[in-house]
UniProtKB/Swiss-Prot annotation:
The keyword rRNA-binding applies. InterPro entries: Ribosomal_uS19 (IPR002222), Ribosomal_uS19_bac-type (IPR005732), Ribosomal_uS19_CS (IPR020934), Ribosomal_uS19_SF (IPR023575). SUPFAM superfamilies: Ribosomal protein S19. This is Small ribosomal subunit protein uS19. Protein S19 forms a complex with S13 that binds strongly to the 16S ribosomal RNA. GO terms for molecular function: rRNA binding; structural constituent of ribosome. GO terms for biological process: ribosomal small subunit assembly; translation. GO terms for cellular component: cytoplasm; small ribosomal subunit. Keywords: Ribonucleoprotein, Ribosomal protein, RNA-binding, rRNA-binding. Coiled coil: none annotated. Belongs to the universal ribosomal protein uS19 family.
Length: 93
């Protein structure tokens, strides 16, 4: 179900408050967040946000091309195990 056009995109208030405070002070430090659903705003460009992936925080540097996407899109939750077969089973066939 899509979000109503009357509503603004979701951003966790605490995260946005921290970003705005850092912009006022011209600070650049990493911010930890568990809010993967937060939408990236233009005010966040240039900051590094550590997004939680379920076991650790993944640092994500925000660029202009990321605006409008969600933070969780840039912190994958599943680790990929390769599909290669064991050498012994490959030799038998």
């Amino acid at each position: 179900m899509t979000r109503s056009s009357k509503k603004e995109p979701f951003v966790e208030e605490k995260l946005m408050r921290r970003i705005l405070e850092m912009n006022e002070k011209n600070e650049k430090r990493m911010i930890k967040t568990w809010s993967r659903a937060s939408v990236i705003y233009p005010e966040m460009v240039g900051h590094t946000i550590a997004v939680h992936d379920g076991r650790k925080h993944v640092p994500v540097y925000i660029t202009e091309s990321m605006v409008g996407h969600r933070l969780g899109e840039f912190a994958p939750t599943r680790t990929f195990r390769s599909h290669k077969k064991d050498d012994r089973t490959a030799r038998r066939r």
